[in-house]
Regions:
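Intrinsic disorder/low-complexity segments
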Residues: 5-6
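Intrinsically disordered, low-complexity terminal segments enriched in Ser/Thr
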Residues: 14-22
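N-terminal strand-loop-strand beta-hairpin
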Residues: 21-144, 184-218
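Residues forming well-ordered secondary-structure scaffolds
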Residues: 35, 117, 134, 155, ...
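Conserved, surface-exposed functional patches that form binding/active-site neighborhoods
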Residues: 128, 132-166, 170
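Mixed-charge, glycine-accented linear interaction segment located at domain edges/termini
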Residues: 168-192
Length: 218
């Protein structure tokens, strides 16, 4: 996904929701609007089988990533601080329907130079919801990203992300994903709704995770 740098932060408004504080803050992104993609997520019966099917279709194979996402309580959409390979850190906000069918997602990504400070500020203002730890294989089929994810406490998953240019209609992404889904033999029974954080909470795995130390990229 493209990366945008947050350039200004107006005064926040803090509200209390249930057990955590939530922060309402508009992020000024200069001339860069939120981007869009079309997404679909599925549980994989066999990671090896799916890998063997996607490799011949991929136009590019990117380096694998170890991603640790810390989700914060947010009044709208989902907000997470992501560390990639213990090096780069991004703050990601996104909003999408919780549907098992392909859906359009709006998202913003900001590079973070002070991850410890940002994590501390967001923890104090919002409260931590959950941590998601995963290994991700990344394949590109033109503008569609195919992620093969092994998620701690959950298992193996596939995620399609059809990245939409400003002039592209969402229907284009839906059609691209439908073609790839058929090629990879993804059935209706494999499809899931929500995000990994929702699955962890539903499984009760989030409560079993150890306390979260500050992020320290190495």
């Amino acid at each position: 996904m493209p990366v945008f740098i947050a350039t200004g932060f107006p005064s926040p408004r803090i509200h209390t929701y249930s057990h955590c504080y939530t922060l309402e803050m508009a992020i000024q992104l200069g001339n860069s609007p939120a981007r869009r993609n079309v997404e679909l997520k599925a549980k994989l019966p066999s990671l090896e089988t799916t890998r063997s099917l996607v490799q011949p279709l991929a136009t590019t194979r990117l380096d694998d990533q170890h991603q640790v996402d810390i989700y914060f309580c947010a009044p709208q959409g989902r907000l997470k601080l992501r560390t990639i390979n213990k090096q780069a850190t991004q703050l990601i906000w996104y909003s999408r329907p919780d549907s098992s069918t392909s859906k359009t997602s709006h998202y913003v990504i900001a590079r973070i130079d002070d991850p410890e400070g940002v994590q501390s500020a967001l923890t104090g203002a919002l409260g931590i919801r959950c941590r998601v730890d995963k290994h991700r294989e990344i394949y590109l089929c033109d503008n569609v990203r195919v992620h093969l994810d092994t998620v701690a406490h959950l298992g193996d998953f596939l995620e399609f992300e059809a990245v939409l240019e400003p002039e592209m209609a969402p229907v284009t992404g839906h059609r691209q994903i439908a073609v790839l889904r058929q090629a990879l033999s993804i059935t209706d029974a494999d499809l899931i709704q929500g995000a990994y954080v929702d699955l962890l909470e539903a499984a009760g795995a989030a409560a079993a995770q150890p306390p979260l130390p500050p992020i320290s990229p190495q």
